[in-house]
UniProtKB/Swiss-Prot annotation:
Signal peptide: none annotated. The keyword Ribonucleoprotein applies. Keywords: Ribonucleoprotein, Ribosomal protein, RNA-binding, rRNA-binding. Coiled coil: none annotated. GO terms for molecular function: rRNA binding; structural constituent of ribosome. GO terms for biological process: ribosomal large subunit assembly; translation. The gene is rplT. HAMAP family: Ribosomal_bL20. Belongs to the bacterial ribosomal protein bL20 family. Binds directly to 23S ribosomal RNA and is necessary for the in vitro assembly process of the 50S ribosomal subunit. It is not involved in the protein synthesizing functions of that subunit. It holds the Pfam family Ribosomal_L20. This is Large ribosomal subunit protein bL20. GO terms for cellular component: ribonucleoprotein complex; ribosome.
Amino acid sequence: MARVKRGVTAHAKHKKVYKLAKGFRGRRKNTIRTAKAAVDKAGQYAFRDRKRKKRTFRALWIQRINAAVRPLGMTYSVFINGLAKSGVMVDRKVLSDLAITEPAAFLAIAEKAKAALAA
């Protein structure tokens, strides 16, 4: 049986790791052992932060909505309660965008929420 030398496959594997480690600093980009560890850790961070990104953006939308309804004499929680009572089914992302780009439309929604709270 012929002897199998793994130079080609090892080189291909290493090349794949180095490609993923491109842009890393120091030995993390060109030493296989540290590059592997760095790529693994980068993958862990990427996985974690894909989840965290959703939380962060939701918090940002809530802050923007809160800032937009405060001058109208409401807090965020009161505004959301008013929306629920009035039956307006607009998510926080859209509300946040409306507050920035279309203040008149946001004001109309806020008035509807206020009316539902009064009734």
